[in-house]
């Protein structure tokens, strides 16, 4: 599978950190939210995991409100229930990027096992936020000039 670099998956830890902490997780996901030509993909299982983390660390009302909002901002993908939600969402959603704090997903061993099946970059949010270049990606995937950000990431 060739991953589409305009499709991004954020693992549950990154989704929760985006809401509860901000920092690098928010900076990384703001890149996605700023551009309507980028897609945030996630499975229901992945969103369930993130909602559970938010509920545990914050409160149930915030978790429910987050889930209602993220559902509208995410393209849902399906995968077998026994699969790792973040990795499977990236694979089944044909994503080019998986953002995760999970060291085991970013290991050389995992990379070598994924490589024959998917063209997928697995990075922590700080690396994605620092290295992501919307203009060059747009120009590599579209026939016209980069129009700049077209959405408010805080809206």
Model-derived segments and spans:
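Short, flexible loop segments at the rims of nucleotide/cofactor-binding pockets, characterized by
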Residues: 16-20, 74-79
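Acidic, metal-binding active-site segment of PIN/NYN-like and related structure-specific nucleases
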Residues: 83-120
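Acidic, PIN/NYN-like endoribonuclease modules and their adjacent C-terminal/linker elements
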Residues: 106-155
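Short, well-structured N-terminal submotif of metal-dependent ribonuclease cores
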Residues: 1-39
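Short secondary-structure boundary segments
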Residues: 12, 44, 101-103
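PIN-domain endoribonuclease scaffold, especially VapC-family toxins
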Residues: 31-78, 148-154
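Amphipathic coiled-coil/heptad-repeat helices and related helical stalk/stem segments
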Residues: 25, 82-83
